[in-house]
Amino acid sequence: NIITIPEDAETNQWTENHWNGGGVYIINGTGAGQFRRIRSHTLTKIELDQPFLVQPDATSEISVTTVRHHLYFINNEAVDVGAYQLYGSVQNCVISGMTMTRCNGIVGRGSLLYRGKQPEWYIDIVNCRLKEGNYSHWFGIDDRGHSGHQSINLIGSGGTGMSIGTVIRRNVLSEYSYIRTSPGANPDAVTDVIIEDNSFDIAKNAVLLGGNATNTSGVLIHNNRYN
């Protein structure tokens, strides 16, 4: 369960055992999409709590960052607010039964944040309702371009593999609410997404896949209803 850190690795706040309990994420290359917790580490070696199922190799890109996982947000409501946002490193989480009215929407943000690549993997956004989809962000005061239509938005910026394995299912989106991806310039920044059994009522774009053909990849859009 030991991995060796390359001599040319880019590090930040990397002192012995400072990141115990944190996570080692394979974000690209062989073994991508796996993470393990750190049991202990020196400046050159990391001991994991358990081995990877697929071992990393010289093609693998690894990020060491915080672990936030197994979180459940059930049957909450928001009116006239900003985003209900998963910000940075989050894994194996569920947002279910959320009702939003005139908000920025539900945002899953896997990004390069505070000098660390913080991926967002294996999120379920299900059984939510987004209604009255016009959103005004400090309109007329300091909008900063944030006003627009309410959305379920998957962000993957700052590298490959920032957003992997999100399921968006059985949501009701009305009055210009919609689903979108917002990848950065890297290939597979947002990947392996299921958009299924959702209902749309009045939308400029029901589903908008951002970037080019490789920035957002591996998307299944199935059995949605459009009015």
Give residue spans per PLM region.
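Extracellular beta-strand/beta-solenoid scaffold signature
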Residues: 61-63, 77-87, 102-120, 134-160, ...
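Small/polar beta-strand repeat architecture
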Residues: 1-90
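Hydrophobic pocket-lining residues within nucleotide cofactor-binding pockets
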Residues: 52, 130, 173, 200, ...
